[in-house]
């Protein structure tokens, strides 16, 4: 028995969950300690009204564990028992990623359980899932993509069965009727009753933190193409954590999703995207791809060898620009 579903953030604001086919919907609620998805409550209430299984997630910034957990729980509010609670652990805009993955996540999960009696689920990419083998009584939601080709729901996602997880996210390029754009597609390994077991509390008296002050409104959004803004973000012009959220305003989700895509996508797929022009050339490409640059560029060069006879007046920079590479 399995369920098909989607996960959404403000990037899909306004999506009509009454017409998009899905058994469950996981909705981004919060990030850090100062961001609430502006479409969170609308999407949640609509999904609830049309009978979807529900999940709510917090995107970690890797700051103070208790503060981030309390902020999330305050915005979960009276939805406890209705929705699965989830921690989203990714590299983008996360100060603790790579340095204390297990310790941070385990502490956050334990704290949320102590306050709610609900065992949250942990989302992470397959490449770091081994770090959470002994995470305790918390399910894993693992992201691993075969490629970036458009796809509908899959009965048997690539690499299924190679590891155990509660939920598998297998594409960020899902295409479903009722929505004109890409969606994250997921498979839950269980029934609706099993989903409900993840959401239910095993405590009788639960007190969640009070609702925090309404977050300050986002600043005016910076202008520019997504590649230009990602480049500036990687250079540090918009800061990290709460500063990045504030400075990017309504462009934040768009930019952060682009950066996160680079972290989780395979080298082969990134190389294909380089050839399509998605990451620009020269210093822009090198900066945007970050630590993935060398492996991706090697793949591009290996599969796209070209030869050029130097002419009088040529420069290395000019040749590199012409062929979309570096020197």
Where do the PLM segments sit?
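Primarily N-terminal secretory
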Residues: 211-222, 260-268, 287-308
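Residues within the helices of the helix-turn-helix
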Residues: 246, 287, 317
């Amino acid at each position: 028995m399995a369920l098909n579903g989607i996960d959404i953030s403000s990037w899909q604001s306004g999506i009509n969950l009454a017409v998009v086919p899905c058994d469950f919907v996981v909705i981004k609620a919060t990030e850090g300690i100062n961001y609430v998805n502006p479409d969170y409550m609308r999407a949640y209430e609509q999904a609830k009204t049309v009978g979807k299984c529900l999940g709510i997630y917090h995107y970690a910034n890797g700051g103070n564990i208790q503060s981030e957990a309390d902020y999330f729980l305050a915005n979960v509010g009276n939805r406890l028992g209705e929705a699965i609670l989830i921690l989203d652990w990714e590299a983008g805009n996360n100060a603790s990623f790579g340095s204390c993955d297990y310790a941070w996540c385990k502490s956050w999960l334990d704290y949320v359980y102590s306050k709610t009696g609900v065992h949250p689920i942990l989302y992470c990419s397959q490449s770091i899932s081994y770090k959470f083998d002994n995470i305790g009584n918390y399910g894993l939601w693992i992201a691993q993509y075969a490629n970036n080709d458009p796809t509908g729901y899959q009965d048997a996602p690539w690499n299924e069965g190679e590891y155990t997880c509660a939920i598998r996210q297998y594409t960020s390029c899902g295409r479903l009727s009722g929505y004109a754009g890409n969606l994250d597609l997921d498979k839950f390994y269980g029934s609706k009753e099993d989903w409900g077991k993840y959401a239910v509390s095993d405590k009788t008296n639960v007190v969640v933190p009070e609702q925090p002050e309404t977050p300050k409104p986002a600043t005016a959004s910076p202008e520019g193409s997504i590649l230009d803004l990602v480049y500036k973000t990687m250079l540090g012009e918009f800061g990290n954590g709460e500063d990045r959220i504030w400075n990017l305003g309504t462009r934040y989700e768009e930019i952060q999703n682009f950066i996160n895509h680079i972290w989780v996508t395979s080298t082969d797929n990134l190389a294909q995207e380089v050839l399509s022009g998605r990451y620009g050339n020269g210093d822009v490409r090198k900066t945007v791809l970050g630590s993935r640059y060398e492996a991706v560029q090697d793949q591009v060069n290996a599969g796209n060898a070209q030869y050029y006879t130097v002419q009088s007046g040529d420069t290395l920079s000019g040749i590199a620009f012409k062929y979309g590479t570096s020197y």
